[in-house]
Amino acid sequence: MSSLTGKVKGRARKIKGDADIRINESTENVGLVIRVMTAVVDIKFPSGKVPKILNALESKEIYNGKKLVLEVSQHISDSIVRCIALDSTDGLSRNDEFIDTGAPISVPVGRATLGRVFDVLGNPIDNCGPLTKSDYSIKPIYSEVPKLTDQKVTTEILVTGIKVIDLLAPYLKGGKVGLFGGAGVGKTVLIMELIHNIAKAHKGVSVFAGVGERTREGNDLYHEMIESGVINLEEKDKSQAVLVYGQMNEPPGARLRVALSALTMAEYFRDVENQDVLFFVDNIFRFTQSGSEISALLGRIPSAVGYQPTLAAEMGAMQERITSTNRGSITSVQAIYVPADDLTDPAPATSFAHLDSTTVLSRQIAELGIYPAVDPLDSASQALSIDIVGEKHYEVSKEVQRILQTYKSLQDIIAILGMEELSEEDKLIVARARKIQRFLSQPFHVAEVFTGTPGVFVSLEDTVSSFKDIVEGKYDHLPEAAFYMVSNINEAVKKAELLQKEGK
């Protein structure tokens, strides 16, 4: 490779090695590109002046309309570092200069971020201009987990207005929730409904991290928040949400770090403003997937099913920061894609250990046309105990699960021999189970535009009392169809009367 001339100002010297490179000896620690492999870039610095691991490097030149930022991931020698690109490396060539910023990737935090949309580096991407400098500070995306003595455990239920969740797998304020499901079973719709139901009623701040999902969905969510008043375009400081996106089209480095950028913004509101923060992530699997891509490019030997060997450590480093402290709380709702509907896949399986509640979406239930397609038997919550939800709620939920479990165990017999071979008691259980199954469905606000059915928010008291009446047999005389897509038992009775008039 020929010597670099005309690019580097000031006194320069040659660095011995595999390339004839001239390195700047000014106050800036400048390195030169020696290798580009898609999202991974090798940079050569003066001997002994390699940047620290996780330091951000910034290009001197402009690529695709902006400066390119790299993150140091490995030290190859005493002068060469291997970096992850946080944007496209199109146009990058050998001998291009990068400056060591001397610090990790940092993002803006503070009230100036409210109502804005950011990328992984904290740059506004909503065409609303730069941030007001007086209203924000800069914070690195890496921070320590709160000390055990500073953490706080809460036992307060977070009411979502969604019957199947509130009854069978309730969420805790300050807890971590996982929405598990395969492709196309309704994870994003469910998380958007939760944002609609919780964020609107929530007095604190909501932070949304779009990790490797569709740009269209991010755009839809932004406009949904504007329409609902969660984001106020006229007076940004009255907004209640911050959006941080690293979408599907972006390189793996951006998708890997965007969750940490969003989490850093959420931590500010918890630790400095002492607020209760809602933290939504869609999708945690893409966080794992991008880590796997980077790991392969860095030359690490893959672990089980091709995932990175550091999967558990990366997941733990992020999840342990999502916690409640004496100053405030972070309640996290995370959508988690399940590859091939296999919950034992290492990516979703690694997430289980960190969660307080798991909501599992089932393709079999979706095929029945029951939405949300939550599996009432696979979903679970640590909050479902007498001490937290009370005796009435606990007993009703356990009876609902018992009836559904019995129905599930009888399905093979029904398929082979038919309903006629069942005992009268089993026939009654099957009839109630089918009513319960349909009553667990509910129209969503965010799906109104597609279904034409107005969405409903069901109070916890209505949910518990309605299911109590069903399991006690008070409404055995109503047809199954009356229980489908209604809010409470009174609506089911009205629907049954309407169906009778129509002769159905």
UniProtKB/Swiss-Prot annotation:
<dbReference type="Pfam" id="PF22919">
    <property type="entry name" value="ATP-synt_VA_C"/>
</dbReference>
<keyword id="KW-0066">ATP synthesis</keyword>
<dbReference type="InterPro" id="IPR050053">
    <property type="entry name" value="ATPase_alpha/beta_chains"/>
</dbReference>
<keyword id="KW-0406">Ion transport</keyword>
<dbReference type="InterPro" id="IPR004100">
    <property type="entry name" value="ATPase_F1/V1/A1_a/bsu_N"/>
</dbReference>
<dbReference type="InterPro" id="IPR005722">
    <property type="entry name" value="ATP_synth_F1_bsu"/>
</dbReference>
<dbReference type="GO" id="GO:0016887">
    <property type="term" value="F:ATP hydrolysis activity"/>
</dbReference>
<keyword id="KW-0067">ATP-binding</keyword>
<keyword id="KW-0139">CF(1)</keyword>
<dbReference type="Pfam" id="PF02874">
    <property type="entry name" value="ATP-synt_ab_N"/>
</dbReference>
<dbReference type="InterPro" id="IPR024034">
    <property type="entry name" value="ATPase_F1/V1_b/a_C"/>
</dbReference>
<keyword id="KW-0813">Transport</keyword>
<dbReference type="GO" id="GO:0046933">
    <property type="term" value="F:proton-transporting ATP synthase activity, rotational mechanism"/>
</dbReference>
<dbReference type="Pfam" id="PF00006">
    <property type="entry name" value="ATP-synt_ab"/>
</dbReference>
<dbReference type="InterPro" id="IPR036121">
    <property type="entry name" value="ATPase_F1/V1/A1_a/bsu_N_sf"/>
</dbReference>
<keyword id="KW-1003">Cell membrane</keyword>
<dbReference type="InterPro" id="IPR020003">
    <property type="entry name" value="ATPase_a/bsu_AS"/>
</dbReference>
<dbReference type="GO" id="GO:0045259">
    <property type="term" value="C:proton-transporting ATP synthase complex"/>
</dbReference>
<comment type="similarity">
    <text>Belongs to the ATPase alpha/beta chains family.</text>
</comment>
<dbReference type="GO" id="GO:0005886">
    <property type="term" value="C:plasma membrane"/>
</dbReference>
<dbReference type="InterPro" id="IPR027417">
    <property type="entry name" value="P-loop_NTPase"/>
</dbReference>
<dbReference type="InterPro" id="IPR055190">
    <property type="entry name" value="ATP-synt_VA_C"/>
</dbReference>
<protein>
    <recommendedName>
        <fullName>ATP synthase subunit beta</fullName>
        <ecNumber>7.1.2.2</ecNumber>
    </recommendedName>
</protein>
<keyword id="KW-0547">Nucleotide-binding</keyword>
<comment type="subunit">
    <text>F-type ATPases have 2 components, CF(1) - the catalytic core - and CF(0) - the membrane proton channel. CF(1) has five subunits: alpha(3), beta(3), gamma(1), delta(1), epsilon(1). CF(0) has three main subunits: a(1), b(2) and c(9-12). The alpha and beta chains form an alternating ring which encloses part of the gamma chain. CF(1) is attached to CF(0) by a central stalk formed by the gamma and epsilon chains, while a peripheral stalk is formed by the delta and b chains.</text>
</comment>
<dbReference type="InterPro" id="IPR003593">
    <property type="entry name" value="AAA+_ATPase"/>
</dbReference>
<keyword id="KW-0997">Cell inner membrane</keyword>
<comment type="function">
    <text>Produces ATP from ADP in the presence of a proton gradient across the membrane. The catalytic sites are hosted primarily by the beta subunits.</text>
</comment>
<dbReference type="InterPro" id="IPR000194">
    <property type="entry name" value="ATPase_F1/V1/A1_a/bsu_nucl-bd"/>
</dbReference>
<feature type="binding site">
    <location>
        <begin position="181"/>
        <end position="188"/>
    </location>
    <ligand>
        <name>ATP</name>
    </ligand>
</feature>
<keyword id="KW-0472">Membrane</keyword>
<dbReference type="GO" id="GO:0005524">
    <property type="term" value="F:ATP binding"/>
</dbReference>
<keyword id="KW-0375">Hydrogen ion transport</keyword>
<keyword id="KW-1278">Translocase</keyword>
